[in-house]
Amino acid sequence: MLISFRTINKKISLFRLLFFSIATSFCSYAQEKNDENVDSLIDELFFNDQQFLDEMLEKNYIYNFIYTSLSYNSNTFFSGRDSGIDQFNIIPQISYYHSSGFNASISGIYYENFTPSWDFTSVSLGYFKTFGKSKNFMYNLGYTKYFYSDDFDYFTNSLDISLGIRNKKQTLGTTLAASYIFGTDESYQIVSNSFMNFTLSRTANFAMRFRPNISFVIANQTFGKYTIRIINGRRFFVYSGTEVFDLLNTQIGFPISFSRESWDLELGYYLNLPNPAADENNLSNTSFIGFSVGYLFDVSKKK
């Protein structure tokens, strides 16, 4: 098979979706109507399960709010792999959550050096619930539609399910999320994320926390290589692909978050440990700095 730009674009775009889905992933937990549990719920919603929104809720708060966020990453790596292009990325997101479990969000991603720079917009709908005696278990079901800036149509939909558990003190937790990504083609991914939670400082209207975390990305992916062949005296690049379902990347994060009233900030260092798959070899570790800012709009009716 001769070189096909769409074949190359397909692989790159799947990596981009894997990156995006991790960067905007979330989990939700307690839904009891008291301050402590509301705080716990919001504590888990956004920024890759690492953002903390504390000490901003009044009594009798109802789960009905809009959350806006803007994330900046100093460099871009797809499944931990260096694409050879140094570029930052920016991810804006607006999400809505209701106490019934319904949630919706719209998001997108901007790359510094891609053309077009605005890669795609995603619209997601979901439903989450907690279960278990202590409400320490949760599940979330969701659907996402992707709208690309170009004519890419390999992966335009995603069906997602996630399961989570954490201890009663909320100092340890883990989630497991699975996605079926499809369009004119299809792929699968599994993402596991585990965290520890340390409160460094806390007052009536301010909180600072450190939560190191580790995530594993397993996905179905076609890896290809190009070889030169001579046909009738002419040179051709011939593509051959190998499909694998394997661990693609391990990421370790060290974020510190600051929250005051309805505002929250997060600053973290992230290390990627990409795992060679198929014919890959000698993959270098990569790292970047992440920064995010968010604001919560309370649209609840107070008693």
Task: Describe the function of each predicted region.
Residues 1-60, 299-303:
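Cleavable N-terminal export/targeting peptides
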Residues 39, 284-303:
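Outer-membrane beta-barrel "beta-signal"
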Residues 57-64, 130-138, 168-173, 199-211, ...:
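Short loop/turn motifs that connect adjacent beta-strands in outer-membrane beta-barrel proteins
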Residues 59-76, 96, 100:
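Transmembrane beta-strand segments of Gram-negative outer membrane beta-barrel proteins
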Residues 64, 86-90, 117-123, 155-161, ...:
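Residues that define the transmembrane beta-barrel architecture of outer-membrane proteins
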Residues 70-72, 92-96, 125-129, 143, ...:
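Residues on the lipid-exposed face of transmembrane beta-strands in outer-membrane beta-barrel proteins
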Residues 78-85, 115-121, 150-158, 187-191, ...:
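Outer-membrane beta-barrel translocator domains and adjoining extracellular loop/strand segments
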Residues 179-284, 297-300:
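Outer-membrane beta-barrel transmembrane domain signature
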